[in-house]
């Protein structure tokens, strides 16, 4: 079974997008970008079980020779990922708050996202682009939050929650993630 690509997706030579039958159905289920292109994936990548949750104005760019395993990419604005980046199982990269922070607005937004919405527009979300530079490694179950830049060659330990920029060749761990050494 092959995965059908949205028409506004560009994929480089030799790239494989795979998953079991359950994950194949999820890969582009929440891909709503109206940009053209809304997703660019470089050459020689292997993305297994990755879920693209991309809003109408969202854009995701992935460089060459990347390896992602069951990662979640959530973009209302922009996620840029460089070359030779590895992202481990169940890691989440998100460029926005999932919902507004104020309780009344959050409830309105949850309804807008539900089948009850009947086409209602979502409220504006606080968004800032995420950039992951070349040769970075993002461990399993790590979370990269909006506005963060992961420097070239940085190493994000499994389970880390990254809320601020990580300098190049720096190793981070924890919630919130903090530097524990260099690579």
Residue ranges, per PLM feature:
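Domain-scale signature associated with acetyltransferase and cell-envelope carbohydrate enzymes
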Residues: 1-135, 140-147, 152, 168, ...
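Short helix N-cap motif at coil->helix boundaries in the Bergerat
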Residues: 164
């Amino acid at each position: 079974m092959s995965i059908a690509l949205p028409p506004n997706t560009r994929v480089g030579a030799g790239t494989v997008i795979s998953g079991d039958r359950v994950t194949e159905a999820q890969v582009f289920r929440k891909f709503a970008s109206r940009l053209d292109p809304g997703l660019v994936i470089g050459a020689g990548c292997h993305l297994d079980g990755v879920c693209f949750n991309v809003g109408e104005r969202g854009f995701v760019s992935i460089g060459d020779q990347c390896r992602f395993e069951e990662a979640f990419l959530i973009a209302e604005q922009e996620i840029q990922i460089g070359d030779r980046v590895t992202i481990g199982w169940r890691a989440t990269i998100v460029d926005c708050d999932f919902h507004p922070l104020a309780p009344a607005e959050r409830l309105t937004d949850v309804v807008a996202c539900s089948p009850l919405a009947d086409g209602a527009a979502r409220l504006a979300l606080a968004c800032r682009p995420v950039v992951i530079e070349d040769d970075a490694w993002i461990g399993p179950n790590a979370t990269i939050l909006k506005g963060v830049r992961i420097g070239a060659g940085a190493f994000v330990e499994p389970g880390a929650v990254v809320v601020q920029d990580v300098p190049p060749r720096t190793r981070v761990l924890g919630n919130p993630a903090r530097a524990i050494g260099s690579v």
